[in-house]
Amino acid sequence: MKAYKVIKSNIHRKGLCAMRNIKGDERIIEYRGKKITHKQADEDSKYGYDITYLFTLDKKYLLDGDFEFNKARLINHSCNPNCEVLDESKSKIWITAIRNIKKNEELSYDYGFSFDCNYKDHICKCGSKNCVGFIIREGSRWRLKKQINI
């Protein structure tokens, strides 16, 4: 049985949720897309400042997941995620559970955006207790808290 389904999300338009209970460490869905070079991403206006669907594979390549067939692109960011992104082979990216996930729970992961990456353009609506209001990787949230005195 497929582990996920597309839903209307309270976080951001659409999302994915668990269709069954999912165990921690279970692979849920492969993040699929087109392999492009960093140079292509820098030169193509499609990418501009919107890095939402790009994953770095290595020093030369990125994976552009902004395609209809890639349902994993619908997984939203959360400051308290239940999934993580694993790049096990430098060519395939998997979304994997980091804890047990209950049926009908929305799937989420930390997008890992840098504090220096126009964070004000990426507002977070996850609603978790530790949300800082912007999509910033966990290791950089202290910088934002210090800047805005949270």
Locate the predicted segments by residue.
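Catalytic cores of histone-lysine modification enzymes
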Residues: 1-86
